């Protein structure tokens, strides 16, 4: 089961073409995505209500889409507007439509009760389209449940072991984070990690304009069910970074990691690593992107193998350790939200 009354990401804006049909499975539901004649994204059930033929192998006609099995035509609200050879259209001849919002270069979709869809609840990823930041968008498909990816993101002690040559340093294994949970009902977690007078990760070393020890930070906010935004960077040791000062030679990033369940055992993952320096250096943009891709492939190797083991021995217990503090809170919040949607007590 999935949490449904929340905003999920369906695609980067560039994944949905100006003309033509795009499709994805989200939360076990086949979804069709396309742009109308005004460029607005439309999200419909990717299934003709007549014989359940997939609409993505149909044809876009203006703002509508036509099934190319028997020719039924649907408008952006999901209503059938034409049945070839039949004048009367039964009221039940319709398909599901989904609320959708395009913001910060992401296409957001609401898979639950449409009446509860409030665009004001969408998490802000301003660095995606801000002129003061530069990034290259990325996407990974996972053969794993999305919660395993969330576990990974809420426990950065794994950086020392999974990413020793990319994102991690030895100190990541022992540093204890500060974990704060929002109590206003959002369920958001803020996790802060400071590495003072420490080595930089290789990813930071590759772009830094200073050498030697650094004060490094990872301040990440996670919003359920699977939206992570992070402020991370390195500054020369002793230059006031923990107090909020950012000297010109400091390297600063804003990171995005977003997951949407595809099925119970597969997931979509959107990411980027934005920077606020050397904005016109396209080679640097590609270098940072490729560095993150290498690191995330390290994650995927571990997480997909983890999924396979869990499917083989689903009833074997897992023994918690201190490093699980963040992911345990995340799991607890996800469980509460799911129960609330299904008649339990609201979080």
Swiss-Prot record:
Its EC number is 1.14.14.-. Binds 1 [2Fe-2S] cluster per subunit. The keyword Flavoprotein applies. Residues 7-109 form the Rieske domain. Its cofactor is [2Fe-2S] cluster. Signal peptide: none annotated. The keyword Metal-binding applies. It catalyses: toluene-4-sulfonate + NADH + O2 + H(+) = 4-(hydroxymethyl)benzenesulfonate + NAD(+) + H2O. PROSITE patterns: RIESKE (PS51296). Keywords: 2Fe-2S, Aromatic hydrocarbons catabolism, FAD, Flavoprotein, Iron, Iron-sulfur, Metal-binding, Monooxygenase, Oxidoreductase, Plasmid. It is an enzyme of class 1 (oxidoreductase). [2Fe-2S] cluster binds at residues 48, 50, 67, 70. InterPro entries: Cholesterol_7-desaturase, Rieske_2Fe-2S, Rieske_2Fe-2S_sf, VanA_C_cat. One of its GO terms (molecular function) is 2 iron, 2 sulfur cluster binding. One of its GO terms (biological process) is catabolic process. Involved in the toluene-4-sulfonate degradation pathway. Does not discriminate between the sulfonate and the carboxyl substituents and can also be involved in the p-toluenecarboxylate degradation pathway. Can use toluene-4-sulfonate, p-toluate, m-toluate and 4-ethylbenzoate as substrates, but not p-xylene, toluene and p-cresol. Also catalyzes the demethylation of 4-methoxybenzoate to 4-hydroxybenzoate. Homotetramer. Part of the p-toluenesulfonate methyl-monooxygenase complex TsaBM, comprising the reductase TsaB and the oxygenase TsaM. This is Toluene-4-sulfonate monooxygenase system iron-sulfur subunit TsaM1. The lineage of its organism: Bacteria, Pseudomonadati, Pseudomonadota, Betaproteobacteria, Burkholderiales. The gene is tsaM1.
């Amino acid at each position: 089961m999935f949490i449904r009354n929340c905003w999920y990401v369906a695609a980067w804006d560039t994944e949905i073409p100006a003309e033509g049909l795009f499709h994805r499975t989200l939360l076990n539901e086949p979804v069709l995505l396309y742009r109308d004649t005004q460029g607005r994204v439309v999200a419909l059930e990717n299934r003709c209500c007549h014989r359940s033929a997939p609409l993505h192998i149909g044809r876009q006609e203006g703002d509508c889409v036509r099934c190319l099995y028997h020719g039924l035509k649907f408008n952006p609200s999901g209503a059938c507007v034409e049945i070839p050879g039949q004048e009367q259209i039964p009221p039940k001849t319709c398909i599901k439509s989904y609320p959708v919002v395009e913001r910060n270069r992401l296409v957001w979709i609401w898979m639950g009760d449409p009446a509860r869809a409030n665009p004001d609840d969408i998490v802000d990823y301003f660095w995606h389209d801000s002129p003061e930041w530069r990034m290259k968008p990325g996407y990974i498909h996972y053969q794993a449940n999305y919660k395993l990816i969330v576990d990974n993101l809420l426990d950065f002690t794994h950086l020392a072991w999974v990413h020793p040559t990319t994102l991690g340093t030895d100190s990541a294994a022992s540093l204890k984070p500060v974990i704060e949970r929002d109590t206003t009902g959002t369920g958001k977690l803020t996790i802060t990690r400071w590495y003072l007078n420490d080595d930089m990760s290789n990813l930071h070393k590759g772009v830094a304009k200073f050498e030697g020890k650094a004060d490094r930070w990872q301040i990440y906010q996670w919003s359920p069910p699977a939206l992570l935004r992070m402020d991370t960077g390195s500054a020369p040791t002793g230059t006031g970074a923990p107090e909020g000062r950012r000297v010109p030679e400091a390297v600063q990033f804003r990171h995005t990691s977003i997951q949407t369940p595809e099925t119970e055992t597969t997931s979509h993952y959107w990411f980027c690593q934005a920077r606020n320096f050397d904005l016109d250096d396209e080679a640097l943009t590609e270098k940072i992107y490729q560095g993150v891709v290498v690191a995330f492939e390290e994650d995927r190797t571990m997480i997909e193998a983890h999924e396979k083991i869990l499917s083989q021995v689903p009833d074997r217990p897992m023994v918690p350790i201190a490093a699980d503090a963040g992911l345990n809170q995340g799991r607890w919040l996800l469980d509460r939200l799911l129960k609330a949607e299904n008649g339990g007590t609201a979080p």
